[in-house]
Amino acid sequence: QVIVDRHGEVLAHEKRMLLAPVQITIQDACRFVSNLGGLFIPAHVNREAFGLLPRLGSVPPDLEVEFLEITRNANKDTLLQKYPQLAEYHLLKNGDVHYLEDFLGALEFYAQGSSLAAIRDGLISIL
């Protein structure tokens, strides 16, 4: 995989294979991120290949998350019909960017500080 700048110029190459299974549960990953002071947001949850919803049929009830990321072309209403439990979450729409032309742009929001709570509240305010 290559790392590029905003002009598409190659800055570096990543030699490690980044698409590989891990030996921890999603719940453990969530706890790990939370313990580091982060906000755990499962990505591409509706994606047919490796997505949480197509693989498990639902979000695990013991997964303590508020946000889920859905794919760029997802229709929110269609997803809510297929997976009604998604109404319990704040849904972010982002892109799985492999090429610069696929980049959707920045997700901008205002936070009342730099704490995790302020960032969380800022995200909620734009959804």
Whereabouts are the PLM-identified features?
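Alpha-helix N-cap/helix-start capping residues at coil-to-helix junctions, especially the first residue
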Residues: Q1-D5, D28, I126
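Active-site gating loops and adjacent loop-to-helix segments of metal-dependent hydrolytic enzymes
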Residues: Q1-K15, S58
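Charged catalytic cores and adjacent phosphate/nucleic-acid-binding surfaces used
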Residues: M17-L18, R31, L36-L39, N46-L127
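Non-catalytic interface/targeting segments
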Residues: V22-I26
